Amino acid sequence: MPVDTAAPQSTANPDPSVQTDRAAVNFTPSTDASSFQFYPDNPESPLARYRFAAKGPSQYFDPCQESANMSMKCLERNNYDRDLCREYFDAYRECKKQWLSARRKDNSQWT
């Protein structure tokens, strides 16, 4: 019987709008500094809205899960030295801020 040696595929965030290939990410799509995005997640994507609406009342949903995973990987790589991973934490906070402001702006799309 052959043994499968392929690396397991991550199923934590199946959102196709999340770009996980670092070479393909364009963090500065324009010269306007307000449009810069320093995290791979898209917390306002239609899939994020659907998954939030479909979850149970006691379930937790994090549209910035990819940023959270990147923060944890950085901590593991750097022996849990928070100072070396500050940019990852800031990116996660920015993603959460974008998500919460989108929910506050139009809560009807998130229920």
Curated annotation (Swiss-Prot):
<feature type="domain" description="CHCH">
    <location>
        <begin position="61"/>
        <end position="103"/>
    </location>
</feature>
<keyword id="KW-0496">Mitochondrion</keyword>
<feature type="short sequence motif" description="Cx9C motif 1">
    <location>
        <begin position="64"/>
        <end position="74"/>
    </location>
</feature>
<dbReference type="GO" id="GO:0005739">
    <property type="term" value="C:mitochondrion"/>
</dbReference>
<dbReference type="GO" id="GO:0033617">
    <property type="term" value="P:mitochondrial cytochrome c oxidase assembly"/>
</dbReference>
<dbReference type="Pfam" id="PF06747">
    <property type="entry name" value="CHCH"/>
</dbReference>
<feature type="disulfide bond">
    <location>
        <begin position="74"/>
        <end position="85"/>
    </location>
</feature>
<comment type="similarity">
    <text>Belongs to the COX23 family.</text>
</comment>
<dbReference type="InterPro" id="IPR009069">
    <property type="entry name" value="Cys_alpha_HP_mot_SF"/>
</dbReference>
<feature type="region of interest" description="Disordered">
    <location>
        <begin position="1"/>
        <end position="21"/>
    </location>
</feature>
<protein>
    <recommendedName>
        <fullName>Cytochrome c oxidase-assembly factor COX23, mitochondrial</fullName>
    </recommendedName>
</protein>
<comment type="function">
    <text>Required for the assembly of cytochrome c oxidase.</text>
</comment>
<feature type="disulfide bond">
    <location>
        <begin position="64"/>
        <end position="95"/>
    </location>
</feature>
<keyword id="KW-0809">Transit peptide</keyword>
<dbReference type="GO" id="GO:0033108">
    <property type="term" value="P:mitochondrial respiratory chain complex assembly"/>
</dbReference>
<dbReference type="GO" id="GO:0005758">
    <property type="term" value="C:mitochondrial intermembrane space"/>
</dbReference>
<feature type="compositionally biased region" description="Polar residues">
    <location>
        <begin position="7"/>
        <end position="20"/>
    </location>
</feature>
<feature type="short sequence motif" description="Cx9C motif 2">
    <location>
        <begin position="85"/>
        <end position="95"/>
    </location>
</feature>
<keyword id="KW-1015">Disulfide bond</keyword>
<dbReference type="InterPro" id="IPR051040">
    <property type="entry name" value="COX23"/>
</dbReference>
<dbReference type="InterPro" id="IPR010625">
    <property type="entry name" value="CHCH"/>
</dbReference>
